[in-house]
């Protein structure tokens, strides 16, 4: 810690580096970042489809009208989610439950996609899986009927005002203790022989842990690959070292790569406001975008005691961490190259769209960081910013001036900041 008698030195440092008034204790230890953040506006990476979560009326009850506004609106005290995931119930008599929230999401400009847990019961058989005689799988002679079942859901939603952006073949076919198992070869067969008849974009295989043995066969089979539009996966327990997917880079041209379900770092009851634990959420999104090149990031239940929206309908600390991306990095924006780790425990990603450059900077250390940002192959005159810390939630900061294509900013200890530069 710096002695309070040295406070004038802190103030001078702020002045000389064009920093605004710090939101943390002015006597707290501050460091100068080890390196600049260089944002190369012309170095384009993946197109971002959006950020969002799951609504599951059959499981935990539907979102209320007010909660839909909080989830999909992009005003003050709203999350700005641009993706909604819904459930394909095996019983078509329950499909109506998905309509109202999906229509609200569409009204706000979000995209809606659907994932099934089970086929209709008459299409399922039990089998012996490693001693479990109650394990379920799709009957081999029902693959075409199952594709039609998915088509029927697409048609039902369309007739009720919801054009699904895409539909999945199966939720977590490799972790199906309570739903339907698929082996890699079964998924491959369906993708090759039946997925082409589905009247929507197709997501597969939605592994629970990004296990490549489920998706490699699809990528290596030209017909199956032609019938897959989006490679979707979940990231439960997936190590960051497994986020990159070289085979997808090699074979997946023209295909999207989505992270379609996760909660992180845990699902502890009433954990959504824990701090600084909630910073793990923005850090996980950062790694998904930068290390995994994912184009979508979808949370599990939108409303849950460990989710982005608490049971009372208010936004949690985890939700505000998501909002640092979802409110500012809008569908169609493109991730651009940026120095991803300019200082210990500082993580940066950058995006562009609508004549803006959006930078999300996470400081997980217990020390504030004075960071220089350099815009390369692009220019701006002023930068707006929003900060979430232990004591603030998406709090607007003072605007920062850009001089010679660079600006200085203070990253408070244990905080996330989103910067928006109008080009």
At which residue positions do the language-model features occur?
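C-terminal segment of classical bacterial N-terminal signal peptides
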Residues: 19-30
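N-terminal module-boundary/linker segments of secreted carbohydrate-active enzymes
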Residues: 31-70
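Substrate-binding cleft and catalytic face of glycoside hydrolase catalytic domains
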Residues: 38-42, 75-219
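Structural recognition of the beta-strand scaffold that forms the well-ordered cores
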Residues: 47-55, 80-88, 111-116, 165-169, ...
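Noncatalytic carbohydrate-binding groove/subsite architecture in carbohydrate-active enzymes
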Residues: 180-284
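Aromatic/acidic polysaccharide-binding cleft in carbohydrate-active enzymes
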Residues: 256-329, 336-344
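Carbohydrate-binding surface patches
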Residues: 341-381, 414
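C-terminal beta-strand-rich structural cap/linker in extracellular carbohydrate-active enzymes
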Residues: 398-423
